[in-house]
Amino acid sequence: TSSRRRLLGLFFKSVPHKTKHAVVDMNLTVERGEAVAILGRNGAGKSTMLKMITGVTFPTSGEIYVNGIVSALLELTSGFDQEFTGRENIYLKGRILGLNDEDIAKLEPAIIDFAELEEYIDQPVRTYSSGMKARLGFSICVNINPEILIVDEALSVGDRAFRDKCTKKVKEIMQGDITLLFVTHSPEIAKAFCTRGIVMKNGKIVFDGTIDEAIDYYATKY
């Protein structure tokens, strides 16, 4: 009733707010085997775009077509059950990524070895440090033989030795016919991994070209 609305209005104010679109009018095609760096400042829409590609979030309009097994190094510890052991979480996350238990069992030794968690793999993940969880998440994602690898600054996991190990592993994966989408703030890392570069600003792609051209554009405009 109007009386009730007036009464509620005495205690609760309606705060106007603006709607912000994280990604706007995007038209992008990435071919199989391409390695694409995505450059842009914080808030440019880079991570949102990757989350839409992986199905973590969905666009309010338009369509996304993904053809291949996607492994995403975005939020490395998402999908873990804190009460499960590390080994049990390997199977849990493997199933989430579309693998069956037989396939996961074949990959399990390599995952544990790469994560350097042999002594802790049968302990609950809630007892792990954040670094241990990230190492396990990274190891699962890079050892499932992905066809599409999506990386969002995930190579900063752990200490220097483990970061170097992660970088080497990603380069090794790229020797196969995989597609790479790589969000980074570092031109050096972008050049090391990618041949094509995209620059984003305010949710839009403002440049798309070779990696050298994209880095020059980003350095000049930002």
Where are these regions (language model features)?
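Conserved ABC ATPase "signature" C-loop
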Residues: 202-203, 218
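Conserved ABC ATPase "signature" region
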Residues: 5-10, 91, 103-120
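The feature captures the beta-strand-to-loop junction immediately N-terminal to the Walker
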Residues: 39-41
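Pre-NBD coupling/linker segments of ABC/ABC-like ATPases
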Residues: 1-22, 212-221
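A short, surface-exposed alpha-helical micro-motif characterized by mixed small hydrophobic
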Residues: 190-192
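H-loop/switch region of ABC-family ATPase nucleotide-binding domains
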Residues: 184-185
